[in-house]
Regions:
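Conserved beta-strand termini and adjacent loop/short-helix elements that scaffold enzyme active sites
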Residues: 1-6, 15, 82, 150
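Residue-level detector of flexible, active-site-proximal loop/helix-junction positions
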Residues: 7, 19, 86, 154
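A short, compositionally biased
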Residues: 16-23
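Short, ordered loop/turn segments at secondary-structure junctions
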Residues: 5, 125, 152-154
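Redox- and metal-dependent alpha/beta enzyme cores, enriched for Fe-S-associated oxidoreductases
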Residues: 149-164
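Nucleotide phosphate-binding/pyrophosphate-handling subdomain across enzymes
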Residues: 18, 28-146, 168
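Short, intrinsically disordered, charge-balanced linker/junction segments flanking boundaries
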Residues: 171-175
């Protein structure tokens, strides 16, 4: 099962942004449907469409699916909006702990809020894959406007050493 072409069981046709919600237009077995969602990012919309397909193939009626799919909330810590500041900035939480996950999260936020600046608060855990630290710093440097490094459970490593490994790829003016 895949999303993206007319020959798929399910095909994402359009995502229409309306304030903080999205209207998701899709086809299932070549018939058009739509529903509303408050989830952030195309990755979560794709997951919703796969949930629609799984429910449908399990025998649940499409009307029942459409009535309920928009009620799905984000998983705690996965592209979860946890606040809004006075200046209308959004605070979005995600537990991205690999370079690929961090890049996916940032690109999904940029898709949804293309005119917004992105400030990132993150760190890397200690006693874990040290090679990912500069990679994550590089991703943050490329895709974020401001970076705030923090400690993320350094375990038995020196927190400053971890931060320095991340900072190697970050321009000074960004953090």
């Amino acid at each position: 099962y895949k999303i993206g072409n007319e020959n798929s069981f399910i095909n994402l046709k359009k995502i229409q942004k309306i304030n903080d919600k999205k209207r998701i237009h899709f086809s299932l077995l070549k018939k058009d449907y739509s529903f509303n969602s408050f989830l952030i990012g195309s990755i979560q919309i794709k997951n919703l469409l796969f949930a629609v397909l799984a429910a449908y193939l399990s025998g649940i009626k499409i009307d029942t699916i459409l009535r309920n799919i928009g009620k799905i909330k984000p998983i705690n810590g996965r592209l979860e909006q946890i606040g809004k500041l006075k200046n209308k900035s959004r605070v979005i939480l995600d537990y991205a702990h690999t370079p690929d996950a961090l890049k996916t999260v940032i690109s999904n936020i940029k898709e949804d809020y293309p005119l917004s600046k992105i400030s990132l608060v993150f760190g890397c855990g200690g006693d874990r894959d040290k090679s990912k630290r500069p990679l994550m710093g590089d991703i943050a440097n490329k895709y974020c406007d401001k970076i705030y490094l923090t400690d993320d459970n350094p375990r038995f490593e020196n927190p400053k050493v971890i931060r320095d490994q991340i900072k190697r790829k970050i321009k000074k003016k960004k953090y």
